[in-house]
Amino acid sequence: MKRVITLFAVLLMGWSVNAWSFACKTANGTAIPIGGGSANVYVNLAPVVNVGQNLVVDLSTQIFCHNDYPETITDYVTLQRGSAYGGVLSNFSGTVKYSGSSYPFPTTSETPRVVYNSRTDKPWPVALYLTPVSSAGGVAIKAGSLIAVLILRQTNNYNSDDFQFVWNIYANNDVVVPTGGCDVSARDVTVTLPDYPGSVPIPLTVYCAKSQNLGYYLSGTTADAGNSIFTNTASFSPAQGVGVQLTRNGTIIPANNTVSLGAVGTSAVSLGLTANYARTGGQVTAGNVQSIIGVTFVYQ
């Protein structure tokens, strides 16, 4: 009887190993073993401006899976479910590309199966995209923000195994995702004016994935009735009687006055801005000058 029990135990062990044949890991080595589970995936976000969608993250470079027994078992893998974008992206819809086909995101149904039949780690073919909205601005994402929760479902042709591999996708870096079809050369530009009464060009350009009419307007606290001289906000030894004024091709630009750039395409277009000193009234005294001026883009 003892020999029978031992033989049965060995046979049971062999059946368990061969039936559970699928496991996954992340690019940094975090694993979800045979039988499923959950893991966090920290991804570096590098958005780009594309026509119709802006890439948020390509998970095919981050998640890999394999089949331990391809001779006897074929594993089938789907994207069973994908959550809405988390945090600051929760109000935006998008798409998910799975094995070359695009689906709504958040997902509305399970995707078709992808076959895993090799011991070699194979990328999980998932990429998330954000659908543009009617703004040329962007959404700031902080490192550590939850981007999405994706559920990989694994079945096979051997038995009734049905396992879930849950991937919590987090941003690994601070980034601004452009939510429109256009983007700018820099989101924070600092220029240094020479001594009074000097001026300096502002190196700011904009480009779009496809040609569209674009404009912009300036915003900030102004010190004059014409809303064109921005207040000196220097906190240390500020100059008196002077502020900052922006011009375009020699023409003064008041705050909240839309400037048309015309058709903007894939080639960067300069905003043509120059920063200048401007008198606000009263006696001018020496000191520091600083102004913070916002630029907002609009589709026309």
Curated annotation (Swiss-Prot):
Superkingdom assignment: Bacteria
Pfam families in the cross-refs: Fimbrial, FimH_man-bind
Signal peptide, first to last residue: 1-21
One CC-aspect GO term: pilus
GO molecular function, one term: D-mannose binding
GO terms (BP aspect): cell adhesion; cell adhesion involved in single-species biofilm formation; cell-substrate adhesion; mechanosensory behavior
SUPFAM superfamilies xref list: Bacterial adhesins (SSF49401)
Keywords noted in UniProt: Fimbrium, Signal
Compartments, as annotated in UniProt: Fimbrium
Disulfide-linked positions: none
Protein family per UniProt: Belongs to the fimbrial protein family.
Purpose of the protein: Involved in regulation of length and mediation of adhesion of type 1 fimbriae (but not necessary for the production of fimbriae). Adhesin responsible for the binding to D-mannose. It is laterally positioned at intervals in the structure of the type 1 fimbriae. In order to integrate FimH in the fimbriae FimF and FimG are needed.
Record protein name field: Type 1 fimbrin D-mannose specific adhesin
Annotated source species: Escherichia coli (strain K12)
